Curated annotation (Swiss-Prot):
Location relative to the cell: Secreted; Nematocyst
Lineage of producing organism: Eukaryota, Metazoa, Cnidaria, Anthozoa, Hexacorallia
One GO MF term attached to the UniProt entry: potassium channel regulator activity
Name of the protein: Kunitz-type proteinase inhibitor AEPI-IV
Function of the protein: Dual-function toxin that inhibits both the serine protease trypsin and voltage-gated potassium channels (Kv).
Principal localisation: secreted
Species in which this protein is naturally found: Actinia equina
Amino acid sequence: DANSFCQLPAVVGRCRGRFPRYYYNTEAGKCQRFIYG
């Protein structure tokens, strides 16, 4: 479900693109931006 999806950690990987995305930071209690790519 959507709730369990929001509990996943941010994962760093390799890519040539740079796309702004957001994830829910459970420690901060809010969405935070990261660069996907």
